């Protein structure tokens, strides 16, 4: 499946626009990562634990969006946008949302 932030796919004709599809992931922040991140903030480093959590959440949101597109018969998603939101009373949750337009593009000729 082609997934792109572009509004079209170069060299491909869009045959059908299906609908907007979403993938959402909400993940909690680990206590041990918080301690490590606090120390890195103090000393001026990067928090690998948080970065890994962010990457995993983004990839899962995209996978979920792709699956929803497949479920309605699409073979591509265009105009993809990814949003991040910190949630919870103590900002202990991260929500990642991937959205785009599910479409059917012409079949690949080989």
Swiss-Prot record:
Q: Which domain of life is it from?
A: Bacteria
**SUPFAM superfamilies referenced in this protein's UniProt entry, alphabetically:** YbjQ-like
Transmembrane annotation, as ranges = none
Which InterPro entries does the record cross-reference, listed alphabetically?
UPF0145_dom_sf (IPR035439), UPF0145_YbjQ-like (IPR002765)
Q: Which family does it belong to?
A: Belongs to the UPF0145 family.
**HAMAP family, alphabetized:** UPF0145
Name under which the protein is recorded: UPF0145 protein
Can you name the source organism? Listeria ivanovii
């Amino acid at each position: 499946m082609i997934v792109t932030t572009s509004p079209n796919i170069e060299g491909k004709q869009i045959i059908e626009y299906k609908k907007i599809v979403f993938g959402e992931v909400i993940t909690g922040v680990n206590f041990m990562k918080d301690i490590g991140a606090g120390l890195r903030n103090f000393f001026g480093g990067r928090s690998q634990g948080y970065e890994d959590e962010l990457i995993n959440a983004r990839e899962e949101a995209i996978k979920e969006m792709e699956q929803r597109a497949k479920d309605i018969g699409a073979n591509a998603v265009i105009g993809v946008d990814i949003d991040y939101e910190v949630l919870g009373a103590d900002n202990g949750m991260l929500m990642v949302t991937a959205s785009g337009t599910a479409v059917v593009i012409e079949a690949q000729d080989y």
